[in-house]
Amino acid sequence: MNVFWFLPTHGDGHFLGTSQGARPVSLPYLKQVAQAADSLGYHGVLIPTGRSCEDSWVVASALAPLTERLRFLVAIRPGIVSPTVSARMAATLDRLSGGRLLINVVTGGDPDENRGDGIHLGHAERYEVTDEFLRVWRRVLQGEAVDFHGKHIHVENAKALYPPLQRPYPPLYFGGSSEAAHELAGEQVDVYLTWGEPLPAVAAKIADVRQRAARHGRTVKFGIRLHVIVRETAEEAWRAADRLIEHISDETIAAAQQSFARFDSEGQRRMAALHGGRRDRLEIQPNLWAGVGLVRGGAGTALVGDPRQVAERIGEYAELGIDSFIFSGYPHLEEAYRFAELVFPLLPEPYASLAGRGLTNLTGPFGEMIANDVLPARAGA
């Protein structure tokens, strides 16, 4: 199992839908979140992409020298940058980070943003571009000089003279809920990602992608993207969930849902359908809450509960075949610690062993010394 955290390059705070309790995006703050995730033992961090975020490649380049083990899941956008240039960027960042780069392939689901970025293609055509892009990108990073003449991409003698540290290339992560996305995942990517839908829906996605991968003689791993609200008791967790959205007005929800309605993303449509823009139908399965999606695009669901409940729900997704979990919580600095302290002890290794110690304090006392010479008692001792 690989547990990731999230870098809030689009802003952070205690509440959704308001500037109250908000924090600006800054390098010092992102450094705090990244170094916390690094020292706590998270496998990596997802860096979001799009016009509402700081650029993910620049952020990863700034933070890689400030961390030691943390991996960075960074987006590539087929159609915006050529596959050859993108491959060289990936090779460089992978080398300079010591092999800590992971690639998130994003086709883009907002037609308005796509047009602003110079992409005037429909849903099906964007997946054609992504397919051709990855065919070139993968071969270039494997050291080939590539000639490719596709419907959308045409390159001659495309090459990267400096190889990536990870071979054959940094692992490819990719999410999408349409048939075209599943076919692409089955043929070309290493890890298929889904947003946090109910268990039956996730199981169906996994089965479909597995079947498509098998037809290509491949196997694919699976990951899920979720928010998390965990507290010592379930009652505290649900109160925290209510507080997270207490400042959101009905007008704000309506405006957000209207914006999401223009998307041609099947995944975004499925996220919106989980709550229907209503506050009174947010727990969509035990401990799975759709409140974040009232105003946030993309991942819109959270695991809510006490540590045992959250760990049990994680275990249920793991039983389906999920082995990469990408979590986030508001505010991201505090919640990175809270999740590690409360849930890591209940997860498989290496996380259970990291709990209560962290990667930077494996042998020393954990907690404040008592009366100048007494070690703090270990919980459960």
Curated annotation (Swiss-Prot):
Catalysis: reaction(s) = an alkanesulfonate + FMNH2 + O2 = an aldehyde + FMN + sulfite + H2O + 2 H(+)
Say if the entry is tagged with keyword Nucleotide-binding: no
The induction annotation reads: Repressed by sulfate, cysteine, or thiocyanate.
Q: What is its EC number?
A: 1.14.14.5
Any one Gene Ontology MF annotation carried by this entry is: alkanesulfonate monooxygenase activity
Q: What keywords would UniProt list here?
A: Flavoprotein, FMN, Monooxygenase, Oxidoreductase
- Cysteine pairs forming cystine bridges in this chain are none
Q: Which Pfam families match?
A: Bac_luciferase (PF00296)
User: EC class of this enzyme?
Assistant: oxidoreductase
Biological process, per Gene Ontology? alkanesulfonate catabolic process
Keyword Flavoprotein present in the record's keywords: the answer is: yes
| Further information | FMNH(2) which is absolutely required for this enzymatic reaction, is provided by MsuE.
Under the heading NCBIfam families, the entry gives: alk_sulf_monoox, PRK00719.1
Q: What does this protein do?
A: Catalyzes the desulfonation of aliphatic sulfonates. Shows highest activity with methanesulfonate.
What the record says about family reads:
Belongs to the SsuD family.
Protein name as it appears in the record: Methanesulfonate monooxygenase
Q: Which organism is it from?
A: Pseudomonas aeruginosa (strain ATCC 15692 / DSM 22644 / CIP 104116 / JCM 14847 / LMG 12228 / 1C / PRS 101 / PAO1)
List the top taxonomic levels of the source: Bacteria, Pseudomonadati, Pseudomonadota, Gammaproteobacteria, Pseudomonadales
